[in-house]
From Swiss-Prot:
It comes from Spinacia oleracea. Keywords: Chloroplast, Photosynthesis, Photosystem II, Plastid, Thylakoid. GO terms for cellular component: chloroplast thylakoid lumen; photosystem II. It is found in: Plastid, Chloroplast thylakoid lumen. The keyword Plastid applies. A 7-bladed beta-propeller torus, about 54 by 55 Angstroms, with a depth of about 25 Angstroms and a central pore. Transmembrane segments: none annotated. Essential for photosystem II (PSII) biogenesis; required for assembly of an early intermediate in PSII assembly that includes D2 (psbD) and cytochrome b559. The gene is HCF136. This is Photosystem II stability/assembly factor HCF136, chloroplastic. One of its GO terms (biological process) is photosynthesis.
Length: 20
């Protein structure tokens, strides 16, 4: 899912399980 902006990728946790 490349819908996230560059800053969003840095802001969100690295673990996808935490984001979803």
């Amino acid at each position: 899912e490349d819908s996230l902006s560059d800053w969003e990728r840095v802001y969100l946790p690295i673990d996808p399980g935490v984001v979803l």
